């Protein structure tokens, strides 16, 4: 099987903005990723408890369970799961960034999300997060 025909990573995307979530899904699927979506942290944790994902992408600012709370719970469930946090805000607290592997501003989504996913899928040693201001 050639590298080009190998399936790409399975991603879990979590965001309470359903329209944006569908856009993320469609965008990532055009690059060959398998994408499962959840509209809340608890729903995402339930999916992660039953399925294995190569990368988890979570919005920081969500009701019920924030992206930071989700990431902490996800680390308990699957300690090695790579997590990318997204936010429209540039003032995400440092403690939230410390529990994820990468951070991407939503304003830079189109140019920064794919490189972050590829890095997390292919790298054995990553910094705790990368902040794109």
Please report, for each region that a protein language model flagged, where it lies by residue.
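Helix N-cap/capping motif at the beta->alpha junctions
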Residues: 37-46, 67
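Short amphipathic alpha-helix used as the core "switch/output" element in two-component signaling
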Residues: 46, 68-79
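Active-site beta3 strand of CheY-like receiver
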Residues: 51-57
């Amino acid at each position: 099987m050639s590298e080009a025909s190998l399936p790409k990573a399975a991603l879990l995307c979590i965001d309470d903005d359903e329209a944006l979530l569908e856009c993320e899904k469609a965008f990532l699927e055009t690059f060959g990723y398998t994408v499962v979506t959840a509209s809340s942290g608890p729903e995402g944790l339930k999916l992660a408890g039953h399925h294995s994902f190569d990368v988890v992408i979570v919005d920081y600012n969500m009701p019920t369970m924030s992206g930071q709370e989700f990431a902490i719970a996800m680390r308990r469930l699957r300690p090695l799961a790579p997590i990318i946090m997204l936010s429209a805000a540039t003032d995400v607290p440092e403690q939230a960034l410390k529990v994820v592997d990468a951070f991407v501003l939503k304003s830079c989504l189109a140019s920064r999300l794919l490189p972050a996913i590829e890095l997390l899928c292919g790298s054995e040693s990553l910094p705790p997060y990368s902040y794109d201001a």
